[in-house]
Amino acid sequence: MTDPISDFLTRLRNASKARQAETTSPHSKLREAIAAILKAEGYIADYKDGTDAAGHKTLVVALKYVDSAPAITGLTRVSTPGRRLYYSYQEIPRVLNGLGISIVSTSRGLMKDADCRRNKAGGELICNVW
């Protein structure tokens, strides 16, 4: 797999469009940090660790729906392995004029765009969620 973050985001997007209650993904610290931000912002209901049949750690994400519509309307990967995009805290673009969030990988860990501006920390723009 060349881009595990895109795989995780695609699993979330596909599961929400298929109206599934939850989805699983191989576990990593980065995926767990992304899930923590999505939960804090109200885009997913919950996440927890699990194991698959082979005994490997997985991340089980419970999706959230509002009036039977997915809470995640859109989810796009911005920085890819072939084209990394870095922004200073002043240059981080707003998603839908502030209605969505950007997840940024900084030297202080993953943060949403508003936290980056508040803490004056730039970094790699991972994805946009709305």
From Swiss-Prot:
The keyword Ribonucleoprotein applies. One of its GO terms (cellular component) is ribosome. Keywords: Ribonucleoprotein, Ribosomal protein, RNA-binding, rRNA-binding. Pfam families: Ribosomal_S8 (PF00410). GO terms for molecular function: rRNA binding; structural constituent of ribosome. Gene3D superfamilies: 3.30.1370.30, 3.30.1490.10. The keyword Transmembrane helix does not apply. GO terms for biological process: translation. Part of the 30S ribosomal subunit. Contacts proteins S5 and S12. Belongs to the universal ribosomal protein uS8 family. HAMAP family: Ribosomal_uS8_B. One of the primary rRNA binding proteins, it binds directly to 16S rRNA central domain where it helps coordinate assembly of the platform of the 30S subunit. PANTHER family: 40S RIBOSOMAL PROTEIN S15A (PTHR11758). This is Small ribosomal subunit protein uS8. It comes from Opitutus terrae (strain DSM 11246 / JCM 15787 / PB90-1). The lineage of its organism: Bacteria, Pseudomonadati, Verrucomicrobiota, Opitutia, Opitutales.
